[in-house]
Amino acid sequence: MPHEPLILVPGLMCDHAVWEPLLPALATGRHCTVVDHGHANSLVTMAQQLLDAAPARFALAGHSMGARVALEVVRLAPQRVSRVALLDTGYLPRAAGAAGEEEAAKRYALLKVAQEQGVRAMAQVWVQGMVHPARLGDVELVERILAMFTRKSPEVFAAQITALLTRPDASDVLRS
């Protein structure tokens, strides 16, 4: 008997490419769909868009920002989600005070690079802090990441930054 469909939710500036290496294993006995957040600028909007396109019941896996979207899906429609996997994410809102301002400043600095020099230039900066140093010499991996980012625009990056900086506290979702 086939399993319920699996919806894969990519992270910040990511798309289907982040899930491609896993799809052969994940798609065994089930239909897999990778969502696109479009120009949505809130996690709740991203979650609602996912729910609007999703089947009545499904499994869910989210990576990074995508896992935060998955938490919002569970908050909005827990009865529709059979199981959920949250990968490399957090659940707390942006910190108050200096820590929160520092997070915003770092995100806006990357946005400025994307707007002034292009998304690829921003991705080249981003990859240095997000890919393990031992893998930075893997030209194929780094190029896949850069190509993935360049399929998005600075406007999409701005919308996703807004979504992350205004993220809700998901502690209650995890407790339930």
Predicted regions and their residues:
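Conserved HGGG/HGGXW glycine-rich cap/lid loop of the alpha/beta-hydrolase fold
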Residues: 1-47, 58-59
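Active-site acidic short loop of glycosyltransferases
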Residues: 3, 54-56, 79, 176
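Short N-terminal helix/helix-N-cap motif within the alpha/beta-hydrolase-1
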Residues: 16-18, 95, 169
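Active-site signature of alpha/beta-hydrolase-fold catalytic machinery across serine-
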Residues: 21, 49, 72-76
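Short beta-strand immediately N-terminal to the catalytic nucleophile in serine-hydrolase-like folds
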Residues: 60-62, 87
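Conserved alpha/beta-hydrolase catalytic His-Asp/Glu region
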Residues: 98-102, 116-175
